[in-house]
Amino acid sequence: MKGKRKTAQDALQHVYKITRDRGVLFYRKEDHIVYFTMQSVLSRRYRLRVLGTSHMYTHVHEGAFPEDIVQLSEYEHDLSSIFAKEYNREVGRSGSLFERPYGSAPKRSDKERRSCMVYIFNNPVEKKLVQRAQEDRWNFLAYYENDYPFSKRPFIRYSRKQLVDAIHLVEHEFRAGRYLGYKMLHRVFAELNAVEREQLTDFIIQLYFFFDRRACEDLFGSIPQMIKATELTTGKEFDVGEEFDPYSDVPYREMCAIVEKHGLMGAGMPFLHLPEERQMKLASFLMQHTGATPWQVARFLHREESRFR
């Protein structure tokens, strides 16, 4: 990701951002929602045309049409900086979160642009998290033609007061031009049942949805054709500086489920702050009960791999 950055006003920029220590970034819904709503607020503030994004466990992909290098750089700088502050407060850490500079590569022909967007959407498929791109929530592909792809649309008059209040609070924050922070999300999710949490998550994503559907239609012909393209090919990207990792991301999902089941995935991420002896026991347990390799456990716990060999 080193070297002079290339850009052009008519080029689709493929942006790639990974954590500095290559550790897991997105563990829970809250992590995705905070980052996604920041993307939404800041892309509108900078008037950046974003076609799509994909949140993976350790990194983020994004496809956007910037007016110039300054617009893209300022947007990415603010996004990384503001999210790092919010995330650091949540997990009790300090310092920058993402590797700098971020990776980017311009795509000037329509063929390159289509291949880039298909690659971004298909990241969860490549990492064996889903069979089809639209089955993954955090590449947001399903939301291009469906407001509630992972839940049933809530009807306010028949919904519990807790869900109605949560919806109104989210609407208020959206109208005020604010992203959703961890404290607010922890509070509202704690008052909802499992079905309502899914409904609220879908509501948040469709409300804050900021991707340029028109640009996607111009590129692929239509949204259904764009989705179909993700089923016909995986797309290819070689010039964005992405770390090569041939392994499945399923172990990360399995480890998240285990840690959550044991009550260690809540506010503050308690599992990251366990005493040394307990964390070593947790690492051993995770390796025994998932398909995780030692280096995946190390990335999950933000530790050196040599400690778990």
Q: Where do the protein language model's features map onto the residues?
A:
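Short, charge-patterned binding micro-sites
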Residues: 52-59
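Short beta-strand->loop micro-motif that forms the acidic, two-metal-ion catalytic signature
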Residues: 59-67
